[in-house]
Amino acid sequence: MLLPLKVLGQVKLQDVTISGKQPKFVRLKGYYRSYQHNDSLLKYYVDGIVEYYINLKNEKVYLRIYGCRYLRNEELISKDKKRAFMLSDQATFRPWPEGTTFIEECRKKYTIQDSANVGYIKKKGQNIGRITTDSIRKCCTIEMDMVPTYDKLSQNIFGFSQEIVSDKFTEAYRLSDEDYYSFKNLIFQKTDQSYNYWHKKDSHKQLIHVVTELFITEQEYVDEKKKESGINLQPQEATQAIENYMSVHGLPLLPPEEQAEMKKLQFYDPAKL
């Protein structure tokens, strides 16, 4: 996957020279969006400006939110069949960087066969991903097919079933002089998952497709996290803040067809559901 040059050019990194005392946190600030289609119709959309503090010692993550929007298609939701026991079909989520980067996890779990600017990720001899280095864009990208890593592709609970169709994961990092990539190098993350979803009494399986993207715009080492909480904005205020943030940092908009579908969605408060 190629990242927009504009995005890569807007990444603001504040590396520091460390002597003696080690920093306590990596601070990441950026924008995320997560949206879900049911049978090709946009049903849920969430996005926001987020700031993460990752503790370098115990790997705990602290989150501050500067503005977040929750939207859904009320017409589609009104058509959902009512069951005695209901499970929400919403699968959008907020990215949560913790532990080690995905590329480091792959180095621990799988074999990586290096070849020029491309490293192939293998599980039991099968190619399941690749790591690509781009010296022009000065980034390293890992792309992974997650399906071969699953023990099983389907699960059932309370009469509802889910069957994985595809699951792709991408992370991109700024090129580093080090021989590994930490969160201080992270600039982009994406998951793209599709699965069939149905109730045992349904005659039709819904195809659910969820895409979640995280664009990192600021990174730095810090000795302490901010004590104040995030900013809780009303929907219209959050919309203005997000649009301004995306414009300032040159972040890519959704494709025109997705933007048109968003006009059919309504704001909602998840705390009141």
Give the location of each predicted region.
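Boundary at the C-terminal end of the N-terminal hydrophobic targeting segment
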Residues: 7-9
